[in-house]
């Protein structure tokens, strides 16, 4: 393999555009793959702007060889639309880094990647699509990966970029902590409000109660998380910019399908599996499912 792996990226949305721009900044521009042939990608951040030249390829038949590293940055609701891309871009020597929410990426993707190794990740930076189709990166980019041999390929690819990459020997705990953060974001969908809503005392109390329910499930699944985690997560939302959104709220406001199952339904599913009461999930999950899928 050359000094740096051949790289493709599927899904140039907010997270995908961020990773593509960071790689482009150091002359490792990935092959861009998606549904729409955008002529370019634009990332804005505190220090300026990065323009990644396109076009975004929208036909898997235009490529005829696998890549060393594939970043998969589509939402889990869009994975079914990516099967042709995964079959084209992957073989048994490929590492697929899933830049996705949830704790089930490996199980969900392994049957689709043509023998490649699936590497889950935790994405720690907020990036949001703007009305002009650019992406606004609102914090320093950071990824956490499991400390396994295939992670080295991602570390090598992102070395020298603005994105910090951390390896964790207890990735299960890290992934579940991020899932708790994502889960409580579901409350924003039902209120149709951004992070400012967490400054309300009643919402903060509801969020804490829900996060404690989530914490019990996370621990049953093997996560080692302190009792302080629910309050820490609420504090993050409380002190965030009032206009900070989350991807599931953006999807609801755009009338797109929601990742309700992998962000919230998973708590209910594993709770029932372990015999853990999930009274808040039992109300929240059907409402999120209905918001996503209707009818009505």
State where each predicted segment sits:
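NAD(P)+-binding Rossmann beta1-loop-alpha1 motif at the extreme N-terminus of oxidoreductases
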Residues: 1-53
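Nucleotide donor/acceptor-binding cores
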Residues: 5-6, 68, 141
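Rossmann-fold dinucleotide-binding core
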Residues: 65, 99-178
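Rossmann-like NAD(P)(H) cofactor-binding subdomain of soluble oxidoreductases
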Residues: 19, 33, 37, 49-132
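A structural signal for isolated positions on well-ordered beta-strands in alpha/beta enzyme cores
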Residues: 8, 31, 95-97, 144, ...
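Active-site-proximal catalytic alpha-helix in oxidoreductases
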Residues: 172-216, 241-242
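Helix-loop-beta segment of a Rossmann-like dinucleotide-binding subdomain
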Residues: 133-143, 190-198, 244-254
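NAD(P)-dependent Rossmann-like dehydrogenase/reductase catalytic/cofactor-binding core
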Residues: 2, 208, 212-296
């Amino acid at each position: 393999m050359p000094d740096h792996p051949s790289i493709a990226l599927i899904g140039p949305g907010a997270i995908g555009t961020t990773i593509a721009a960071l790689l482009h900044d150091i002359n490792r521009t990935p092959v861009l793959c998606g549904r729409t042939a955008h002529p370019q990608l634009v990332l804005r951040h505190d220090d300026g702007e990065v323009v990644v030249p396109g076009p975004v390829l929208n036909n898997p038949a235009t490529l005829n060889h696998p890549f060393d590293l594939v970043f998969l940055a589509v939402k889990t609701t869009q994975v079914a639309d990516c099967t042709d891309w995964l079959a084209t871009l992957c073989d048994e020597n490929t590492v697929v880094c899933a830049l996705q929410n949830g704790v089930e990426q490996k199980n969900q993707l392994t049957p689709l990647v043509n023998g490649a190794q699936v590497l889950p990740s935790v994405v720690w930076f907020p990036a949001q699509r703007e009305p002009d189709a650019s992406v606004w990166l609102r914090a320093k980019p950071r990824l956490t990966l499991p400390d396994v041999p295939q992670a080295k390929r991602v570390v090598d690819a992102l070395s020298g970029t603005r994105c910090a990459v951390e390896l964790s020997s207890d990735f299960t705990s890290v992934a579940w902590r991020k899932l708790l953060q994502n889960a409580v974001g579901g409350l924003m969908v039902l209120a149709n409000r951004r992070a400012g809503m967490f400054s309300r005392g009643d919402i903060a109390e509801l969020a804490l109660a829900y996060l404690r329910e989530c914490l019990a499930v996370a621990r049953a699944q093997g996560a080692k998380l302190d009792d302080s985690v629910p309050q820490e997560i609420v504090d993050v939302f409380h002190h965030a910019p009032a206009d900070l959104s989350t991807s599931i709220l953006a999807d609801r406001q755009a009338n797109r399908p929601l990742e309700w199952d992998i962000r919230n339904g998973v708590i209910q599913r594993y709770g029932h599996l372990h015999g853990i009461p999930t009274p808040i999930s039992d109300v929240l999950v059907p409402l999120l499912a209905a918001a996503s899928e209707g009818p009505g």
